[in-house]
């Protein structure tokens, strides 16, 4: 398995434009979720980890969300995002390893998951869940999409099943929604689960 745990792996992918899973737009289910949020949500602390080209971060910014943090450990997509959104607060663009973020320094009301879970080595999925729970404030939420298929491959994206995901998340989260997405991007119809879960007290 290629070393997806290293920033160099992802930096090279972006430099070579070898990011076949990139949709080039905001994911429709996540756009729909964002669009129904109340005005009061626009000041909440939101994390988008492993954001890549960060279309969702850009959309949140355009809609007036003022406390969104983008994290990726490849410099290339962060630099590209900063070029596209010169008014985005630079202190919220973090080039770092998600697993090394300090919960003492960072706490979020909710996290948006979009093709990050599928990019990490599957052996780190429990570690992902633990770190995600640690970075969320009490009653914090994890919102997003997970692939609902096994790609049977040794490189990202790495898929899985609903039953497998439940086993990973149930220890630290109350799963409110983990169901097939009805409004996925056409090429992903039938292969995504929409998730909404709340960190356990």
Task: Describe every region a protein language model picked out.
Residues 1-48, 52-105, 120-201:
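Class I (Rossmann-like) S-adenosyl-L-methionine-dependent methyltransferase catalytic domain
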Residues 112:
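A conserved beta-strand element that flanks and buttresses the S-adenosyl-L-methionine
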Residues 115-119:
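Short catalytic micro-motifs in class I SAM-dependent methyltransferases
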């Amino acid at each position: 398995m290629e070393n997806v745990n290293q920033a160099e792996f992802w930096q090279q992918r972006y430099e070579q434009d070898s990011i076949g899973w990139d949709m080039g737009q905001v994911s429709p289910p996540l756009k729909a979720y964002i669009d129904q949020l109340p005005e009061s949500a626009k000041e909440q602390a939101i994390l988008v980890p492993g954001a890549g080209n960060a279309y969702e971060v850009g959309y949140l910014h355009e809609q007036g969300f003022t406390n969104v943090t983008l994290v990726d450990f490849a410099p290339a997509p962060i630099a590209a995002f900063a070029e596209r959104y010169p008014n985005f607060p630079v202190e919220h663009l973090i080039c770092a390893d998600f697993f090394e973020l300090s919960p003492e320094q960072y706490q979020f009301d909710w996290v948006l998951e979009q093709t990050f879970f599928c990019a990490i080595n599957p052996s780190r999925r429990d570690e992902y869940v633990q770190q995600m729970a640690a970075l969320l404030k009490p009653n914090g939420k994890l919102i997003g999409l997970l692939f609902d298929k096994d790609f049977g491959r040794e490189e990202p994206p790495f898929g899985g099943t609903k039953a497998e995901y439940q086993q990973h998340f149930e220890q630290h989260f109350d799963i409110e929604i983990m169901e097939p997405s009805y409004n996925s991007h056409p090429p992903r119809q039938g292969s995504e689960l929409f998730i909404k879960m709340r960190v356990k007290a």
